Amino acid sequence: ERMKTRVKELRTAANMTQQQLAELVHVSSRTIISIEKEQYNPSLLLAYRIAKVFDTSVEELYCLEENLELDEKQYRELQTDVGKGEQ
């Protein structure tokens, strides 16, 4: 399973380079590049370290694609339900 990641989004928002993030979490910049391209799923320890850098949770940083699709479906259903209730 592939995990969707917000690493690049959070890193760029923090004006941080891939090299800077790599140094903070004790990996190579190539590892960060692979994570951002979603070519590599990090270990739980590395995911935790990255989340800690951005003061967020592992759950906020990563989600499985299937969970993302489910969340989007649930969101659309909720919008439909709310729309019906407002009429």
Set out the residue ranges of the language-model regions:
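A short, Lys/Arg-rich alpha-helix, primarily the initiator
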Residues: 1-13
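Residue-level signal for the short linker/turn that defines the boundary of a DNA-recognition helix
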Residues: 5, 15-16, 42-45
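Alpha-helical residues within the helix-turn-helix
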Residues: 12, 23, 52
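Short alpha-helical DNA-recognition segment
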Residues: 15-34
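DNA major-groove recognition helix of helix-turn-helix/homeodomain DNA-binding modules
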Residues: 26, 45-60
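DNA major-groove recognition helix of helix-turn-helix
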Residues: 36, 62
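Short, charged recognition helix plus adjacent turn
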Residues: 63-87
